[in-house]
A protein has these predicted regions:
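Extended, well-ordered alpha-helical scaffold/bundle regions in very large, multi-domain proteins
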Residues: 220, 228-229, 243-247
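Sequence-specific dsDNA recognition surfaces
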Residues: 13-18, 33-49, 63-94
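Short coil/turn segments at secondary-structure boundaries
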Residues: 4-13, 45-52, 74, 152-155, ...
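Proline-centric
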Residues: 21-30, 122-134, 146, 150, ...
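Non-catalytic DNA-recognition/assembly elements of restriction-modification systems
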Residues: 13-43, 167, 175, 179, ...
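A short beta-sheet element
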Residues: 61-63, 73-143, 155, 165
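Core structural elements
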Residues: 1-7, 187, 208-223
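Hydrophobic alpha-helical scaffolding
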Residues: 21-25, 85, 128, 132, ...
Length: 254
């Protein structure tokens, strides 16, 4: 049949009615936790001077994130003491995907420096050999994925918790198509930026057209309509099996 099923433990569940739209045959619907792990940040105690005096490590808040951009600087920095006591001495590495998790939900940025962030942001780590390809795919499309799955009052109220994020359904294409989708989106970026510039100069233009144009391109991408389907692509179901094997291997090493 044309129904979609998900196996959870020994139970097989029909999830067809939970799916927001159709995807190509060689894509799969999967839970976010099956393709990526994520970590929430922290805010060191504001009344503890040793955490904020002599700050040397960038500490990102949502206001420091720039939508779908690489970010390098923050308004505030934490001390070496704060890093050691509140973050176990661990910085989030440069190149990591960040996404706003509360308030302004779904804003994505790439870390341009080693840093830490607050609890309103998650750092995302794809569970896949070619992490950059999936990172770039999620960087471009997570905002739209989050918008598409706004099916609960909690998400609509801009409060997204770890459980809801883990179980969020993601349309997942083959790896080669992820790369093609990102390349296609990047081709449109200069055109959209130029239109944005012209829009700002022409006050009579519809102020919403820029956002609508950008969103329509991303919607085509997320539904598998932006680039031609290639029958030679390894199906996303096979990619998902590779990810599961890698995840299992990592758990076995702990």
């Amino acid at each position: 049949d044309n129904r979609h099923y998900e196996k959870v433990g020994s139970e097989v569940k029909d999830i067809t009615d939970d799916l927001p739209f159709e995807i190509p045959d060689n894509w799969v619907w999967t839970r976010f936790s099956q393709i990526a792990s994520f970590e929430l940040g922290k805010t060191p105690d504001r009344h503890t001077d040793k955490f904020w005096n002599n700050g040397i490590y960038p500490w990102f808040a949502i206001s420091d994130l720039q939508e779908r951009s690489t970010v390098f600087s923050t308004k505030e920095k934490i001390s070496a003491t704060a890093l050691k006591e509140k973050f176990a001495g661990k910085l989030v590495p440069q190149g990591t995907l960040l996404m706003s998790f509360k308030l302004t939900v779904g804003r994505t940025s790439i870390l341009g420096v080693d840093a830490v962030h607050n609890e309103a942001i998650i750092s995302v780590f794809p569970i896949i050999p070619d992490k950059d390809a999936t990172r770039n795919f999620l960087f471009n499309l997570l905002p739209l994925i989050v918008e598409y799955v706004e099916t609960t009052d909690a998400i609509k109220g801009a409060t997204l918790n770890s459980s809801k994020l883990s179980s969020m359904l993601v349309p997942f294409p083959p790896l080669t198509e992820q790369i093609r989708i990102v390349a296609e989106i990047e081709k449109f970026e200069p055109l959209i930026a130029e239109y944005d510039k012209l829009e700002q100069q022409a006050t009579k233009l519809d102020e919403e057209i820029y956002d609508k144009l950008k969103k329509s391109i991303l919607q085509y991408a997320i539904q598998g309509k932006l680039v031609p389907q290639d029958p030679n692509d390894e199906p996303a179901s096979v990619l998902l099996e590779h990810i599961r094997a890698e995840k299992k291997a990592k758990l076995g090493k702990k």
